[in-house]
């Protein structure tokens, strides 16, 4: 997770940045964060930490690129139905199904459509961050242990 969400992001950005800067005005970077980077949940410490990194990296990169015309956005999806949960649950289809049961989660196409919209905003507009959640989800995820006296 750290290799993909942090190192992969940094190395890929470093590789592509010279071309984006050369392109100038209208060039765009859309990083995929997560609402887990803003709102903790039980069992999400490493994942949430890596996605918090994506958010700070994006904001700092935007500052570093001021004057270049390159835009930087951190897109932060919430509950999205994808193979991510199947991998997370070690292939347990029942847990995967339970994660999305009755929730009408975001679909990968929703995220793709949002990225398309971000990329097609006017060149003078930068969307710093954007949270995207299904209407069935909220960020009020406080964990409460009700089994303690």
Regions inferred by a protein language model and the residue ranges of each:
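A hydrophobic alpha-helix adjacent to the NAD(P)-binding/active-site core of NAD(P)-dependent oxidoreductases
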Residues: 1
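Active-site helix of classical SDR
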Residues: 13, 50
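A short helix-coil junction within the Rossmann-fold of NAD(P)-dependent oxidoreductases
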Residues: 15-26
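Alpha-helical segment proximal to the catalytic Tyr-Lys
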Residues: 18, 63-66
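Residue(s) in the substrate-gating loop at a strand-loop-helix junction
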Residues: 34
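Active-site loop immediately N-terminal to the catalytic Tyr-X3-Lys motif
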Residues: 39-45, 103
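C-terminal helical subdomain
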Residues: 74-78, 93-141
């Amino acid at each position: 997770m750290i290799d993909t969400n942090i190192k992969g992001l940094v190395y890929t950005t470093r590789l592509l940045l010279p071309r984006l800067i050369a392109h100038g005005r209208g060039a765009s970077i859309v990083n995929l964060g997560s609402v887990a980077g803003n709102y903790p949940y039980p069992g999400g410490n490493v994942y949430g930490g890596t996605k918090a990194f994506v958010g700070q990296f994006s904001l700092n990169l935007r500052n570093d690129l001021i004057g270049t015309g390159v835009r930087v956005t951190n897109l932060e999806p919430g509950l999205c139905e994808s193979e991510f949960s199947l991998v997370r649950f070690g292939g347990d289809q029942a847990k995967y199904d339970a994660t999305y049961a009755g929730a009408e989660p975001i679909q990968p196409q929703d995220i793709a459509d949002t990225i398309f919209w971000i990329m097609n905003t006017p060149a003078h507009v930068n969307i710093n961050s954007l949270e995207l959640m299904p209407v069935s989800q909220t960020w009020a995820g406080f964990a409460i242990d009700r089994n303690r006296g």
